[in-house]
């Protein structure tokens, strides 16, 4: 069956047919005139028409996009590379809804060698097309510090901001600073260092930053020997220090390939709407570092599209670091290869998809790193999402309960007992809407006899807000009681007696009603209220903590009253038996062979003997 047209009623066939066949950028607009997608093409007409043809290659996201296209604008360029650069800039500026969003990496720093007489080496977060040479971005601050320390140690690069023109230097306008006297600068400001010597040093630094440490060491070694032969021992000694520093730096780099070819390795990982691309920079067989970039709004985009975005962005921003080979996890089309070769200025640049051996392992390692960084990114994204949920909940609590401030610290009490015995209370603490488990506390209650829920609450609140715990933990902004009117009033009275003005509320389970002290009628929050959802989360956590503690106490008492009386059985052995059989009754019914599966023959015999004596 031939391909069928999509959305042809919106975009007239005549308009599609009249589109030019040259390179450029196309912009899709919706019926409000908003640009919703930007793309680039070697042949605009062919590329745009492909969106309006039904077929297996059309993704769900593309179908949705096409259904929203009301108009098309184009911008012609002289080459596909110009189109690529323009597309990149337009996407950054316009952030169209249906484009893959590249997370802005402007927070990552670059090293820049300035385009001026006697260039300086600076850190910047903005890449400008000003003739300067940029290296980076450095996603790891430690890596950037390591490189800067190395350069400062072995290369006397000027650190001043002086405008060192030939006229300014010859006029004697400047004087050397402290850096000259401590031998970290050779004084070009006073003409003590020739510009050609300074620029030779800058080229050596560029070689270092490009990973050409082996070639640099060989060049410096030859120069050192020449100085020594010419009896210029001081200059030879300076070069020796530089060479030793370079060798130490090289030794710290991880060797990942036996052959000394310069390579970039790309890896991609995707999860639902997010993706991460990682690039390994390998120079002379050593891994110099890695860069990563994150994408959102990828939806059902194919990996080929994500890989293309990674390649384009990376080589747009780092045109001075082109390797001999680029390893990819999957192939890209020939047009993209040609565009990237034109972009980098290297028509011999090789794109390789390794299948076996060491090279394939490099790509696999890069993909593993992309997965790892994507997982970390998603965790952080989830945390940000939780924060965006928690802040409105805390604000709603403050407004609903008429609190003087936002309840940053909330403590919640829940009591537990078994048929009126083994009373316990748990207190959980939430700070900023999140559990702070280090501040959880549990209380074994024993100041009263029989079944008395109010006495239990009185003891728990008294013990928390008096004595050593009062000094050990900060006071909360809000106290939540798992209970109704009577429980809340009991807690409030204790606080009054202790002279504490802390807001306290109760949250009853059955109807999720909120009770305030000395107020007969409960307050009801909407079921969808973020404040109620946060209170429920805190209350449920207090209940979980209370039940866990109470169960542990009951188990311990069961052990002490039923098993530890048997010779040779301590608490650990008793716990092991209970975990295996489930109860003392089941242990009493067990055969010797069953008990031997858990303990030794002597202990098994003691258990059987103990329960025989208890039989009527």
Swiss-Prot record:
UniProt keyword terms in alphabetical order: Cytoplasm, DNA damage, DNA excision, DNA repair, Excision nuclease, SOS response
GO biological process: nucleotide-excision repair; SOS response
GIY-YIG domain sequence ranges: 21-100
Compartment(s) of residence: Cytoplasm
Pfam families attached to this UniProt entry: GIY-YIG, HHH_5, UVR, UvrC_RNaseH, UvrC_RNaseH_dom
Residue ranges that the Swiss-Prot or TrEMBL entry lists as coiled coil: none
UniProt cross-references to InterPro entries, sorted A to Z: GIY-YIG_endonuc, GIY-YIG_endonuc_sf, GIY-YIG_UvrC_Cho, RuvA_2-like, UVR_dom, UVR_dom_sf, UvrABC_protein_C, UvrC
GO terms for cellular component: cytoplasm; excinuclease repair complex
SMART domains according to UniProt: GIYc (SM00465)
Molecular function GO labels: DNA binding; excinuclease ABC activity
DNA repair is among the record's keywords: yes
Top-level taxon of origin: Bacteria
Residue ranges of domain UVR in the record: 214-249
Function: The UvrABC repair system catalyzes the recognition and processing of DNA lesions. UvrC both incises the 5' and 3' sides of the lesion. The N-terminal half is responsible for the 3' incision and the C-terminal half is responsible for the 5' incision.
Subunit field text: Interacts with UvrB in an incision complex.
Record family assignment: Belongs to the UvrC family.
Entries under HAMAP family matching the protein: UvrC
The protein, known as: UvrABC system protein C
Organism from which the protein derives: Prosthecochloris aestuarii (strain DSM 271 / SK 413)
